[in-house]
Amino acid sequence: SRERFYAHIDDYKGKIILRPQELSNAPEVIRRLSIIAMNTAIEVDLAGNVNSTHIGEGAVMNGIGGSGDYARNSGIAIFSTASTAKDGAISCIVPHVAHVDHTEHDTEIIVTEQGLADLRGLTAYERAHVLIENCAHPKFRPGLREYVEQAYAQSKAKHGIIRL
């Protein structure tokens, strides 16, 4: 918690360095240090695209900050989210995100309380299945599987997912 962090702030002396955003978010610094970038997501789609800023039909939840710089230039880009929202009524692993802040090319690992999906080197079809099996809430897995199989069956190119 924030209170616990500040209560022990002296313990972190020499372990945490705070720098201006111009330095800490600089792509060259991030790249050279091979930083592990950990960011939050509101929702993740079956291709691996991440929405970090918008809810529903466009309501802005927060700003993107430096997460784009970190995701694109880090050694490993990790995004975490809950598997559901609204007390389990809504899946945070969805066929298509409402808004794309980070493309599938910038995301490598997705984490929910259900598990971890390592998307590196996978095809779109494989990414979808890894996200469903490892990150989606069990209640939503059948519908997500059905979506992927229908999209794949209708696709002329059997390497990707199409919109229905």
List each model region and its residues.
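Conserved phosphate- and dinucleotide-binding cores of soluble alpha/beta proteins
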Residues: 1-164
